[in-house]
């Protein structure tokens, strides 16, 4: 499996570049929704950058989870935390959903679908921003409105450790080497 290890400073720079792409397009979101976990820090950076440029927005993190229903393997998505947005938005508003990667697109599709169902005539204009897009994995007709990189590699974000070998952590996350040596006996 070909992995792409993304460094924290690289992700932050990409987050600001993503915000600039949104700004340059003329889109002015007055709501920004970061998808927990990976989209939250990117959403914060996008919101901060746009705010500096005079685009103020209300912002919140939401969460999704995948679950299985009878006979289906993990195809169902549950969205948590949309109530605040649903109660606040109006049809003339602009909402930007920020995530770390647009993979299958199923989670983003479910978020948008849930917003449209709940908001009905008050559904705002919705756009999606992600630093990474995996077009071959996309199972929806939607692609992100704003993205920086197309890839099919397995992405390893700065906060991710699960599923990595000690060798991978040492090589690609050298700043953790002292901590890894301390915890290695506890998890080996």
Question: Residues of each region from the PLM?
Answer:
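PRPP-associated nucleotide enzymes
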Residues: 1-188
């Amino acid at each position: 499996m070909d992995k792409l290890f993304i460094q924290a400073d690289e992700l932050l720079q990409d987050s600001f570049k993503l915000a600039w792409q949104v700004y340059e397009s003329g889109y002015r979101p007055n709501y920004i929704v970061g998808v927990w976990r990976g989209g939250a820090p990117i959403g914060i950076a996008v919101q901060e950058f746009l705010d500096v440029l005079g685009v103020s927005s209300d912002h919140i993190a939401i969460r999704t989870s995948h679950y299985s229903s009878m006979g289906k393997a993990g195809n169902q998505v549950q969205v948590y935390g949309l109530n605040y947005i649903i109660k606040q938005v109006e049809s003339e508003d602009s909402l930007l959903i920020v995530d770390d990667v647009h993979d299958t697109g199923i989670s983003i599709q479910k978020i948008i679908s849930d917003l449209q169902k709940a908001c009905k005539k008050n559904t705002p204009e919705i756009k999606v921003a992600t630093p990474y897009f995996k077009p071959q994995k996309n199972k929806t007709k939607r692609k992100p409105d704003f993205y920086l990189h197309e890839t099919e590699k397995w992405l390893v974000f700065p906060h991710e450790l699960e599923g990595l070998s000690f060798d991978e952590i040492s090589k690609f996350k050298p700043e953790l080497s002292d901590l890894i040596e301390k915890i290695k006996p506890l998890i080996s």
